[in-house]
Amino acid sequence: MEKIIVTLENHFDQVWRRCFKRNIENDGYTYISYEKIEEMYIDRCIEIAEKRPEFRFQIETAVVVDNYLHNHPEKKEVLRRLYDRKQLRVMDSGYYITDSNMIGIESFITDFLLSDRFLKDVFGEVSAVVTRRDAFGNSAQLPQVFRDLGKKSIAAISYSRVYGDVWRGIDGSAVCVKQPTFAGGAGGWKKLVPCPECKGKGCKKCDYTGVDRERERKEWWNLTVYPERILADEVTTITMGCEELTPAESLVDEVNALKSKYPIEFGFNEDYLPYIEDINAKLDCGDFSGLSVHPSFQVNFNNTGCYVSRIKTKQRLIETENTVSDLEVLAAKKYVSTGEAPDFSEIYKHYLFGAFHDSIAGTMVDAAYDEIMAAYDSLSGKIEAVSARLTDKTESSEKYFFNGLPIKRNAVVYMGCPNGKNIEISGEGVKTLGCDGKIATVLVENIEPYGARVFKITEADNKSAKATETAEKVAFHGTVLNGADEGTKFSGGEKRVIGNLRYAVTINGNGVESIYDKILRKTVCAVGAFSPFEHVLETDIGSPWTTLENYFNKTRLRDYTRLIGVTEKSGYAHAEFRTAIPNSMSGESNDNVIEWKIALIDGVDEILYSSRVEWHNFNRRLKVAFPATGNGEAFYSAPGAVIPAEKYEPYFSWSGATGDYPAYRFAAVEADGYVATVFNAGTPSFGVEKSNDGAVMFVSILRSPTVPTYLHEPQSYTMKAWDGMRDNGSHEFRLALKTYEKRSADIVLDAEAFAHSLAVIDGAAANAELPIVKDGKAVITRVKPAYDGDGIIVRLIDENGDGDETTISLPAWVKSIKLTDVAENEKRDLPTSGKTLTLTFRPFEIKTLKLKRGK
């Protein structure tokens, strides 16, 4: 055999069965934080390494090192010394091992830039090896990002099997995934148990750690070697590690004892790089001859219940992504004006905690969920403070709507009403369309790219507003068919048509009957197996990770829906409905109610859906149906790319995939001469079912799993504070339906505009022009100050895969342009003559530019 590399590395979660920085108190026991467990691992490894020079260990993520050094700054030189002696390496998994299906491509890139800059600062270099261990899927643009970051190997991909030597992304970029043969291991899956003496509080018996150290030593598996896997002409690996257990010095003796039989030593994943140099040399030249290529451009699907479990983990992340993006644009404007820009590192670390794979997936105990929500709450104050430094506040009561996107648009904004009072929002091109004392619906017309609009908030006369609203409402109550535990059904009621300049929507007492597109001149949605915007209750027996049983009984809720009222004004109409889910469909739990409406606004070519849901259910999933009149290809937006909904065979296991797709911004289906598209804002779970009547798109907005899976491991410990996985309580959702003549890049822009609402800021943004797309299909996904303070970063992606030229405007302040990689390393100069720059994109290509000011 060539060599046996022994790697030691624990997998470190930030949240899951524990909190990151908080202890959990439950039933009289204390469960220590992951932070403390990670410290125990590093301290133990340092202790062994200082005594045994042949010992080597890895740390999985930058956040673990950063957090450790924050708490123990005196250990920085110790870690550096071990690194220089080749006893320590830190894998490049990003700052956190994030999800890659439900977060924006810019969040994914930022996570790696944050990691790489931190590791370079501490250790002077960054690993060329990536790990995606335990991430629930890998999307289509990752190979391109990894290649641009200079990564040479992916050492671990979990749950979905990767086949072959190479994974080729949707743009054609590829990364090596070949790994040495697994020949043995040591470690253990069991978790640290609270000390029985002190119940986790910390005492002399447990060395004040709060865990049962004696049991921990017994749980560690001894080294096991599989001789039949050690081949004469190959490099093999022995992998040691756990999630919580810490290694013992005896491991070194066990490895040394094998040296008489094998060429074996402790090492790192990077030690395999010389053995795949030939593969990487071919990839550098775009040569795939003789290489085995993974059959898909993504490594999905698994754990598909994560797309909807604990839905606020998805919604809060999307909101925060948008807010941080707006902040970066404000900072870019400030930089152009003053040459100064804030450091966003701490904000990035804070918000990307919510992008960690178990965070956004919703696969955690209740206390960890609370920690994530609290982190978002505390981040709001930090963002407000930075925003105040980037804007100029006036003495008046004026506020500003700010458009953080590079497109001109009509934008609908929903603003909360203070103290339940009706409010009026006014300003040039600003209209208050309606206010119910909870939410004011506002239309901001023709706001420029990166532009702002002044507005004022005044309190409306509640009495007169209520009287006007009552006069405009006409309630249609159907006929009650039955009641009691089986619920109240409604039937009948007049038909009525409401609409805007684009759509005519026929409604009745039970919901929406049909939708007619006035531009395409055809009915694009109609009642069939399901009604447009109908809520559907589906049996879903599973865990937060996935549905576990192949039983999907769907119950239409149309008959349990009644029309509450219709409001029509000049240029605006909406219909309000109430759907009450019967107790018999909710585990005899009452108060499962959906209050929802559809709104149509002149100047907004979408049918807007919003809902408030009171949810108290068990083993159920709530979906919204969108029937189309054709059975063409389904496709959806992944981070940074529009991709087809690849057919896959559902499978049912603890990490299974049961038919859904992660639609980051939109899902669509090609119908009868048109494309029906559904936009979302943090509800990515999308499925499509086809029949002779046409395709029905379903967007899942809630689920209530009751199987805790690995949240409950009696062989480790029992801590049952995970009932929140059923997502009990109040929720709010927004969706939109829009139809197109054909698939185009316009869908990408419209979906982004729907999900990314206007920001509300207290001061004026700096008066500085930023680049926009003048012509072409690529879209600008990021504008921000360069990390080195020497320019503005502009990233463009051909998300729709058109592969054509795109022209951007060049503001007068631009004196030079550099093409860079995603890490902002300059590659070459680009021309600056004239007022525009034209770039040629291959399909799905990512390009990063640095625009520099004059001296």
Residue ranges and their predicted role:
Residues 62-66, 97-99, 127-137, 240-245, ...:
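Conserved short loop/turn motifs at secondary-structure junctions
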Residues 108-141, 148, 219-239:
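CE4/NodB-like, metal-dependent polysaccharide N-deacetylase domain
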Residues 58-67, 94-96, 130-139, 157-161, ...:
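Short, solvent-exposed turn/loop segments enriched in Gly/Ser/Thr/Pro and often Arg
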Residues 1-106, 110, 119-121, 148:
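N-terminal catalytic cores of secreted or lumenal carbohydrate-active enzymes
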Residues 6-15, 25, 152, 179-199, ...:
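Catalytic grooves of carbohydrate-active enzymes
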Residues 74-94, 143-176:
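Acidic, His- and aromatic-enriched active-site or binding-groove loops in soluble protein domains
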Residues 123-163, 247-254:
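Catalytic domains of cell-wall/extracellular-matrix polysaccharide-remodeling enzymes
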Residues 142-145, 179, 191-199, 203-204, ...:
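C-terminal (or distal) subdomains of carbohydrate-active enzymes
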